[in-house]
UniProtKB/Swiss-Prot annotation:
One of its GO terms (molecular function) is type II site-specific deoxyribonuclease activity. Belongs to the TdeIII type II restriction endonuclease family. The gene is hgiCIIR. This is Type II restriction enzyme HgiCII. Keywords: Endonuclease, Hydrolase, Nuclease, Restriction system. It comes from the Bacteria. It catalyses: Endonucleolytic cleavage of DNA to give specific double-stranded fragments with terminal 5'-phosphates. It comes from Herpetosiphon aurantiacus.
Length: 273
């Protein structure tokens, strides 16, 4: 078992608290009931959440559930980061969320990274350069001798017991183009900062799950494949959780989510229906 009982309970407590918080926030929001067309159209919403066609055709109970599900899904991404941190602490020396690297590098390095990202942005080819190829370009540039201070943040930082480092940007498995470019820029900056480190450094775009299936080959989202080094810089589902813990971590974590979901289902249903 890769997730020990103590960590398992920590995760369950955290997820229970997360759902309680979501329910508390939702309970403070009033879903406008549809009684008749005239009264609904006469209503004013400061939040801009009036949906006359939806409210006309969809039962109010379903609308409430849908609204809660969207709210829950928005916040669910943060639970992946915290669960990864807690699990990583059982398997590695250090695990920190929102990890900041304060650094000073030559102006030319920062500018070259931005240029590489700009080239990816304008990419009309199927394959962008690999992370390794881009780092080789950075190492060959002429320096200005003028240093610039920057802070680069990683969603999750892990230091293994051998001193090697892992940096993760944990994002949606269906990002837009801008999000892909932002992650690639951050990964390149991390590698540039760590280029003289004597210990191995790896930086990844991490996806907590694969919407298309269990294996990597099933992932077909074209934007990620076009605007990231998908082969070398992206880890998905099982790959990510195995780096955090062990090969069984992904399925064990899903089982914990399922246990919490089942235990909270009656409470959620009671409050929403």
């Amino acid at each position: 078992m890769s997730i020990n009982p103590i960590t398992r309970n920590k995760i369950k407590d955290y997820l229970n608290g997360f759902i309680d918080q979501q329910l508390a926030v939702y309970s403070q929001r009033n879903l406008r009931e549809f009684h008749d067309v005239d009264s609904y159209l006469a209503a004013i919403s400061s939040d801009g959440d009036l949906k006359p066609f939806h409210a006309s055709i969809i039962p109010s109970a379903i609308m409430r559930l849908n609204r809660f599900e969207r709210s829950l899904s928005t916040g669910l991404g943060s639970t992946f980061e915290e669960c990864a941190r807690v699990i990583a602490l059982d398997h590695h020396a250090v695990a920190i969320r929102s990890y900041d690297i304060h650094t000073s590098l030559d102006q030319a390095v920062w500018a070259s990274i931005d240029l590489l990202i700009s080239n990816i942005d304008r990419n009309n080819q199927r394959q962008i350069p690999s992370i390794t190829e881009m780092l080789e370009k950075l190492q060959s540039i002429a320096l200005t001798g003028i240093a610039e201070n920057h802070v680069v943040r990683a969603d999750l930082y892990v230091q293994r017991h051998d001193g090697s480092e892992l940096f993760f940007e944990i994002k949606s498995p269906k990002p837009n183009k801008g999000q892909c470019l932002e992650v690639m820029q951050r990964l390149l900056r991390i590698y540039a900062i760590k280029q003289n480190s004597t210990l191995p450094t790896h930086a990844f775009y991490a996806m907590a799950y694969n919407p298309w299936g269990a294996n990597r080959a099933s992932y077909t989202y074209s934007i990620v494949k076009k605007y990231t080094d998908f082969t070398n810089a992206v880890v998905i589902g099982q790959e990510f959780w195995s780096l955090i813990g062990e090969s069984s971590t992904y399925t064990e974590l899903l089982e914990i989510y399922r246990e919490v979901g089942l235990s909270k289902s009656s409470e959620i249903t009671k409050k929403l229906l």
